Amino acid sequence: MSCRSEHIWIEPITGARKTSNFCWAVILFLGSLGFLLVGTSSYLGRNLISLFPSQEIVFFPQGIVMSFYGIAGLFISSYLWCTISWNVGSGYDRFDRKDGIVCIFRWGFPGKNRRVFLQFLIKDIQSVRIEVKEGIYARRVLYMDIRGQGAIPLTRTDENFTPREMEQKAAELAYFLRVPIEVF
């Protein structure tokens, strides 16, 4: 949901707080917890989970491997939960024709570069570019070519826009910024 007036266009960017990330984090957490409990129950020789009798799983080597997978899965799951809680990748793109400035803001991982803030003059924008890669994993990305800076992506690579939606978005942005469109 973008906010747009005659002179200012603000485009919010979704970060890590997507439904798919929540689903993967929950599935990974529950699966790795299950692996860890099965490995622990094979070590203790008692049934911590009633689905698998501990006598059928020998601790060496199956129990050790399942415990390792459980611990590794918990680490990956905690990484996913941290990116979700920090909302990594979220932010906004602000195009201000009145002041002639484009601001791109994104949240990153905690640390020195937690806030990523880029600022350009509109007169330095050469074009709005659509890059299309067809095939099994088709991908369409919208870029902004900045003189002396190169191309800056404006859409995420995991956003699946239809060709019409991507063309519409590029045309609206190019019209707003008064720059040409390039397609690669």
From Swiss-Prot:
Does the keyword Acyltransferase feature in the UniProt annotation? Answer: no
The compartments listed are:
Plastid, Chloroplast thylakoid membrane
Pull one GO CC term from this UniProt entry. Answer: photosystem I
Please report the record's description of how this protein sits within the membrane: Multi-pass membrane protein
Looking at the UniProt entry, the stretches that span the membrane are 22-42, 57-77
- Entry-linked Pfam families: Ycf4
Which cystines does this chain contain?
none
List keywords of the entry alphabetically. Chloroplast, Membrane, Photosynthesis, Plastid, Thylakoid, Transmembrane, Transmembrane helix
**Matches recorded under InterPro entries:** PSI_Ycf4_assembly
One of the GO biological process terms: photosynthesis
According to its UniProt record, which protein family does this protein belong to?
Answer: Belongs to the Ycf4 family.
Q: What does this protein do?
A: Seems to be required for the assembly of the photosystem I complex.
User: What name does UniProt use for this protein?
Assistant: Photosystem I assembly protein Ycf4
Q: Which organism is it from?
A: Lactuca sativa (Garden lettuce)
The lineage, from the top, is: Eukaryota, Viridiplantae, Streptophyta, Embryophyta, Tracheophyta
